[in-house]
Amino acid sequence: FRGLAKLLKIGLKSFARVLKKILPKAAKAGKSLAKSLADENAIRQQNQ
């Protein structure tokens, strides 16, 4: 059990490190995606 807990802790630490690297990029991508969707909606409303 103790070894398993240690492995889990190490796994969580490396997972957190990967998340910290990925999250800023994901946030940027999400923002640009949301912006493009909002722009599309605005264009669609103007065309009606």
From Swiss-Prot:
Question: Principal localization?
Answer: secreted
Keywords for the protein's UniProt record, in alphabetical order: Antibiotic, Antimicrobial, Cytolysis, Hemolysis, Membrane, Secreted, Target cell membrane, Target membrane, Toxin
Where it sits in the cell: the answer is:
Secreted; Target cell membrane
Top-rank taxon, per record:
Eukaryota
Q: Where is the signal peptide?
A: none
GO-annotated biological processes: defense response to bacterium; killing of cells of another organism
**Residues spanning the membrane:** none
A Gene Ontology MF term for this entry? toxin activity
Q: What does this protein do?
A: Disrupts cell membranes, particularly those rich in phosphocholine, through formation of pores. Has antimicrobial activity, hemolytic activity and insecticidal activity.
Q: Which family does it belong to?
A: Belongs to the cationic peptide 02 (oxyopinin-2) family.
The entry's protein name is M-oxotoxin-Ot1c
